[in-house]
Amino acid sequence: MKNIIIILYLFIVFNCDKPDSLDVEIYKLDNGLTVMLNEDHNETSVFGAVVVDGGGKRDPSDATGIAHYLEHVLFKGTSKMGTIDYNTEKIYLDSIEVLYDKLASTEDDRRRLNIQKDINRVSVKAAEYAIPNEFDRLIEGMGGTGLNAGTGSDFIYYFNAFPSTQIEKWMEIYSHRFLDPVFRMFQAELEIVYEEKNRAMDNPFRVFYETFRKYFFKKHPYGQQTVLGSVDHLKNPSLSKMKEYYDKYYVANNMYLIIAGDFNKREVKRLIKEKFQKIKKGGTIEPVNILEKPFKGREVVDLVMTPYRMIRMGYRTVEPNHEDAVVLDVIQNMFNNSSRTGFLDRLTAENKILSAYATTGLGGTDLGGFGFQFVPKDDKQTFGEAEKLVLHEIDKVKTGNFDSELLDFIKLNINMSHETRMESVSGRLWLIMSIILDNKPWEDIKSYPEKINSVTKDQIIEVANKYFNDNYLIVRSDKGDHDKVKLEKPPFKPVAPKNTEAKSEYAS
């Protein structure tokens, strides 16, 4: 009876006609910028985002962290926004750029200190002309909420929500910020980035994860670089290299504009062309084509860096747009799911292991990976014993040791979660972003429930045996402290802009 109910539910919910609110129109402007529109009048607001195909993987190998740092700086305004007198301010900003480049090429500690003092002196002077947080105030002034940005390995995004009546103003402000950015308040933002990096380095679990990725991705920037950058590179930031990154990747043919919510497409298309056609077109951006070799059997790395013993295990799989990715999604939910009925969930519930979970998200656009993290139940349980327990659960999937009722329930769970995300504009916005990251058409998102429903037991067995083989990485951390490194802030005088209530030429 339970199976009949599940099948009937799936048929009714996922085979009915999809409303227009789930449609996404995708087209390109003449300059190559990709526009993605999702009109939904069930909402009273609009969500807007600009996405750049870049991220930490495209940081120069000698200047890691640049993409993330640039994301911070792009909130500081333009030659017309965020300044009371750009012509005078620019004299100091140009000097700061020269000094930072000089600092990056200087190794002598005494000379570095003198250069840092010069940077501080000129930065304090430049701050006399800056208007802090004017971009944020402009967005808030038009009723915008949720203003944020983020940098991942594969892309950078900027977004917020706003009233539908403010869509023209939003497009004007967002297009302007990318047309003519000025890299001001560099020292102040560097201090914020230092704080982020120090928090990350203080977190043993994050350090353990980044160390695992270093061994998992032995060549690709996914493992050999971090989004926040290395300590050495953050100590020697280069404004010139940041500008080079901006000039190369913040170009129309490498950017995406996403608008979802309560708007009229016909009216908005005219505004989009007017505002975003101005963004310059750049050269062809080549993909990061770095492949990883299979692991040679069971590769083991032993460390001491976490408050309690824990293990990460990883298998090479496929990129997100591969046909096996959907099957791997089902498999991941067979190990863990929100109803706590997965194979690894049961290990924890039966007190055989303290915690265990699986993830398909080890990689990104370029390369895939399926990971497991688990914690032995106590000090008596060895790493080997905990690993055997997890491998035994993996074998259940590989041998088909599960019934069809569990599989139907897993599919239902996945599809209900997907439908929940599709129902809201904010959830849909992130799904639209995901097709950029995963290099998929929107139709794949709409048809995802049908693809999940079509996954068979035989497919699960085949895919599990294809990827969960004898070649995998296992990184084990014994209980102990990791080596902590702290980024010390240079002996700078705080940069405190005076013009907190001023308005720029742009905002007036």
Walk through the language-model features, giving the residues of each.
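Sec-dependent signal peptide recognition
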Residues: 1-9
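Bacterial Sec-dependent signal peptides at the C-terminal "C-region" and cleavage site
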Residues: 8-21
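Mature N-terminal segment immediately following signal peptide/propeptide cleavage
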Residues: 18-52
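M16 family metallopeptidases and their MPP-like homologs
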Residues: 38, 43-56, 65-66, 83-176, ...
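Active-site recognition of the HExxH zinc-binding catalytic motif
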Residues: 64-72, 76
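An aromatic/glycine/proline-enriched structural segment found at the starts
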Residues: 177, 181, 201, 218-223, ...
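Non-catalytic, conformational "gating/processing" segments within enzyme and secreted inhibitor domains
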Residues: 187-191, 197, 205, 209, ...
